């Protein structure tokens, strides 16, 4: 049993918590957020995207009690004050989006935790790990990142294709669901003017660091991929469009067969495969981080192909945070 603390009970913090309820080998023992316990219970119990929490949620004497288990609740701004050791926390899920460097995340270590997993790309050279891509290279680093949800979708797919046929170069577009950083109506956004436009009214071109991050977790593709994002007015589930030029010739049918073999083999539980007539909402709640859509892709010729893969940018990512915790705890 790995004891886990969560710092930041927003979208990812709460979905990680929900996912952890399905894991008998993970126990959430502490949550830190500036929300009070009553509101924390409310936001866990009711979710507009994922529905009602499947279980009991109460607040008793300031603690969050979920399915009869008491969870310590704190509201500390400085992670150094969290005293994780008092409740036996081994790993902290850093999901505030604020402590994304070695220096700032180390405050959790100072507070008694053994390790930290960031739920987003780091702001420094903190090592990133993606399950199915480079998780086996973990060497005991106390502070790591689970990269981004888009990187977790793109990297497994790109790795399979590159190892089978070789990728000369590629462009990626993620058609990405709305996230909490966006505006409900037009509002100030000085660093990204288009990002300040109303999320429900627009398709918004944006940047993404996912292709560059793939080069870090899978160096064979370093410098070979770049990409962009379109933010679209849907609440959840995103899709990657990966267009690549191949070294070795391959028919689209051959590529699909290679991806299917990986999904049923070494990438099982990470990469999925579907030939159904699916749309985005069909992937809401799917724990896989990348589901290849056979019928959505196309090829121009045996060297130039477009591949499409879906991901629940909340659920799939959160499950891989937990998978990474278990993998790094088993060392």
Swiss-Prot record:
Enumerate the Pfam families for this protein: Gp_dh_C, Gp_dh_N
Name its GO BP terms in alphabetical order: glucose metabolic process; glycolytic process
- One GO CC term of this entry? cytoplasm
What are the binding positions for D-glyceraldehyde 3-phosphate in this chain?
A: 148-150, 179, 208-209, 231
Main localisation: cytoplasm
Residues annotated as catalytic: 149 (nucleophile)
At which positions is NAD(+) bound? 11-12, 33, 77, 313
CDD domains, per this entry? GAPDH_I_C, GAPDH_I_N
Q: In which pathway does it act?
A: Carbohydrate degradation; glycolysis; pyruvate from D-glyceraldehyde 3-phosphate: step 1/5
Q: Does the keyword Oxidoreductase apply?
A: yes
- Top-level taxon of origin: Eukaryota
Compartments annotated for it: namely: Cytoplasm
- EC primary class: oxidoreductase
Q: What is its EC number?
A: 1.2.1.12
Which UniProt keywords are present, listed alphabetically?
Cytoplasm, Glycolysis, NAD, Oxidoreductase
PROSITE patterns the UniProt entry points to: GAPDH
A GO MF annotation of the entry reads: NAD binding
- Site note Activates thiol group during catalysis applies to 176
Q: Which reaction does it catalyse?
A: D-glyceraldehyde 3-phosphate + phosphate + NAD(+) = (2R)-3-phospho-glyceroyl phosphate + NADH + H(+)
Subunit description: Homotetramer.
PANTHER family xrefs: GLYCERALDEHYDE 3-PHOSPHATE DEHYDROGENASE, GLYCERALDEHYDE-3-PHOSPHATE DEHYDROGENASE-RELATED
Tell me which family the UniProt entry assigns to this protein: Belongs to the glyceraldehyde-3-phosphate dehydrogenase family.
- The protein here is known as Glyceraldehyde-3-phosphate dehydrogenase, cytosolic
Species for this entry = Leishmania mexicana
Gene transcribed to yield this protein: GAPC
């Amino acid at each position: 049993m790995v004891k886990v603390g969560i710092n930041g009970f927003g979208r990812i913090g709460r979905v990680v918590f929900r996912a952890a309820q399905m894991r008998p080998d993970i126990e959430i023992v502490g949550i830190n957020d500036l929300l009070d316990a009553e509101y924390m219970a409310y936001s866990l119990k009711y979710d507009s995207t994922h529905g009602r929490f499947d279980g009991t949620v109460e607040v008793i004497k300031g603690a969050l009690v979920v399915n009869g288990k008491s969870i310590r609740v704190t509201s500390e701004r400085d992670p150094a004050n969290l005293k994780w050791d008092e409740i036996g926390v081994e790993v902290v899920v850093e999901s505030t989006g604020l402590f994304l460097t070695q220096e700032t995340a180390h405050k959790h270590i100072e507070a008694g935790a053994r390790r930290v997993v960031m739920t987003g790309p780091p702001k420094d050279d903190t090592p990133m790990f993606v399950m199915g891509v480079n998780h086996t290279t973990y060497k005991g680093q106390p502070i790591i990142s689970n990269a981004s949800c888009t990187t977790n979708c793109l990297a497994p797919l790109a790795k399979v294709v590159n190892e089978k046929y070789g990728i000369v170069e590629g462009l990626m577009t993620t058609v990405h669901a709305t996230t909490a950083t966006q505006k409900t109506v037009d509002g100030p956004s000085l660093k990204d003017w288009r990002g300040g436009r109303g999320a429900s009214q627009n398709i918004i071109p944006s940047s993404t660091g996912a292709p560059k991050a793939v080069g870090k977790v899978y160096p064979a593709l370093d410098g070979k991929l770049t990409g962009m994002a379109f933010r679209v007015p849907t609440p959840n589930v995103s899709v990657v469009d990966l267009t690549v030029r191949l070294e070795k010739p391959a028919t689209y049918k051959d590529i699909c067969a290679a991806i299917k073999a990986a999904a049923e083999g070494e990438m099982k539980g990470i990469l999925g495969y579907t030939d159904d007539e699916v749309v985005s909402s069909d992937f809401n709640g799917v724990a896989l981080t990348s589901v290849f859509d056979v019928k959505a892709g196309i090829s121009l010729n045996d060297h130039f192909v477009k591949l499409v893969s879906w991901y629940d940018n909340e659920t799939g990512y959160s499950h891989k945070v937990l998978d990474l915790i278990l993998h790094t705890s088993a060392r």
